[in-house]
Every structure is written in C-alpha cells, then in structure tokens.
Amino acid sequence: MKIVRVTPLPLSCRSANGPMTFFVVRIETDDGLVGYGESCDCFGVSFPAVHAAVVRDAFAPLLVGRELIAVAPLVDELRVSTRRQLGQSWASAQARSAIEIALWDLVGQDAGRSVSAILGRVRDTIPVYAGSSPFLDDHDAAFHLDRLTPMLERGVRHVKLRTGPDSDRAVDVLADLRRLLGRDVEIMVDASESLDLPTTARISDRMAELDVRWLEEPLLQSRHSAVAAAAARSRVPIAAGEHLFSTEEALAALVAGEISVIQPDPCISGGIAEAREIAGLAAGFGARAVLHYHAGLVGLGAVLQVAACAPGVDLLEYPVHLDTVLRTQSGGDELGISAIVDGRLALPDRPGIGVAPLASVLSESLIS
C-alpha cells in the first residue's frame, strides 16, 4: 500500500481541568485505509503547531508516495534524514512518534490484526493507576481524595499525586492523605523536575515513611549526574521516562543508575516498537517498567497496544481529568473511567491500534 496523504492535526479539547491542546497525525493510503498517531510532550502537547510544522515540512515530504511494507525502515529514514537539522529528541522525536504510531495503525488494519497481536500479545487487561494533576500543596487531603474517588470506586489501588512549589507542605498533605486512604492503596509522587538535590533527599526520607512507591522526576532529567546522585541517596525509588526519547537514552539512564522505575511512552519515545523495547530493558537492570500516558484517545490506543505486548510492564498511567477527552474523542465510554473494572482496563484487540477518533470531533477541535 502506498502513502498518499499525511495530515497534521493540532487540536484543542476540553478536559476536566479545562482546555488542553493535543497533536494527532492522520496518514492515508491509496487503498483507502486511514491510520492515526499522536504525540505528547508530557501533558498533551503544549505547542501543537510546532509538531504540525515538523510533520508538514520535514516528515510528510519523505513519506508521501512511499510504499508501506514495514514501519521501521520508514521511521528510521525520518530520523536519519532530519537529525542534523532537527535533532533526535524533544519535538522531533515526539512528532516522529506520532508518525510511527499511525504507520503501525495502517499495518495492523491492512493485516486485519491488532498491533499487539503482530508484535506478540501477552495480556488482555492491565492495572491502571490514577494520575491526579492538582498540586498536593495547593489543597487539603480531602480535596485530593475527592478527585481520586471516581477511580477508587472502580477498584483502582494505585494513585499518583504531584508536588508543587512548597514541597514540604506537599508531604504534610500527603501524610494526611495516606491516613485517609489507608495502607491498601499504593501512592506515588511526581515532582515534575522541580526539586534540587537537598530537597529531594529531605522529602524522599519523609516519603519513605509514608510508603511512597516512587518519586518521579525530582530533578531535570538532563542533569544526569545529579539524577544519579539523587537515586543513590533516595530511600524511595526514582522514576522517569517521559523525557527519554529513544532506547539509547533509556539504556544510558539505566546503566548510570539514574532510575529504578522506567516509564516509556510511545507518544514520546519514538513510537510503539521503541516504547516496547525500552520496557524490555528494565528487567536486566532490576528495574520496574510502568507506562506513561498523558495524551488523547489515539495516544491511549498506542499505549494500550504496548501494554498488551510488553511482558515486563505491570502498570499504566490513567490521568483522572482525561476521562472527558477520551469520551468526547471516541463518542463513548469504552476507555473512560467507567470502563475500568477491578482496577484494570481492557486492552483493545481490533485491527491497528484499536481506536479511532470521531471525524466530526477532529473537525470541531482543529486549531486553525
């Protein structure tokens, strides 16, 4: 099948927290198939027009007219052909991830099989954790419990909260929340690269007493020696992955001892195959593999395909506020919070990535 059209789609959709922006790519073939992919920069896509420009100006001309026989050669050509001009990380890698996902969607549809079936499906459901975006230090424990309740009621027993500018206050609130949740719910904390080494050491000691299962991105991921020092000192496992843009970068972080929980995301790290490969590195370093997700419907479809074919993955992020986005883009509740049963989400096994956004919603959400 031949690629005939590559269309970048910068989108704006309303989440439970308010408007968010996203980036989706649509790829069409000469036999009428349509594949979708999505990128992410950790929280939707803050500058979707940038990703659109990368796809429109750099990637699309390399793809239109090409035969889609296998995904990897085309994606590698995008990387090699543009790396000296665009680099191999950040917006370039994120936009390339969207392309890779869309190509896999097409390959799966053409074969009449899910991507995970092609790559080796190992499970049909995955446990999820509730990701809550408001800062711990901005509200009391009762507020945070209320935010988490819809997912706790669906049997979810893993939750992640975020620290804000007042990290000590955040841990105080976390202690109150731990008392409300009891010890049957696992708690994780995301610092969003906001701390320094002394603060990381201090609050990780306090978090260890609260049985926090990981502290995510306490420092800028680019400060490798500092991250490694924090990991060596912390009594709580250090997690990261949403700023790792390739298997090579993930391997370097694991070798350096920077992380013990790795969090690949196919919308960031190069696509479905790359995220699966990154997840596969974890066991060799005694690390845990947990999938990051913070995009829209197409992104979740890609993440779920990785979850279905990556044997070492044991947990998947599910941001509470994205339920609204998922229901809007799909026109149903199949992947909304109400679809979570006993804390687990079913993994689609339809051809391709198993999901497709409503064309009408894409048109209405398109940023001109």
Q: Which positions does each model-derived feature cover?
A:
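Conserved, mostly hydrophobic/aromatic
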Residues: 32, 59, 99, 112, ...
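Shared catalytic-loop signature of beta/alpha-barrel
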Residues: 54-57, 87, 205, 211, ...
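Short, glycine/acidic-enriched loop or turn micro-motifs at the edges of active sites
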Residues: 41, 163, 192-195, 219-220, ...
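Extended hydrophobic packing segments that form well-structured cores
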Residues: 351-368
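Metal-dependent enolase-superfamily TIM-barrel catalytic cores that perform enediolate-based chemistry
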Residues: 117-234
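Structured beta-strand/loop patches that form or line metal/cofactor-binding pockets in enzymes
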Residues: 1-44, 325-327
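Metal- or metallocofactor-binding catalytic centers and their adjacent structured scaffolds
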Residues: 28-110
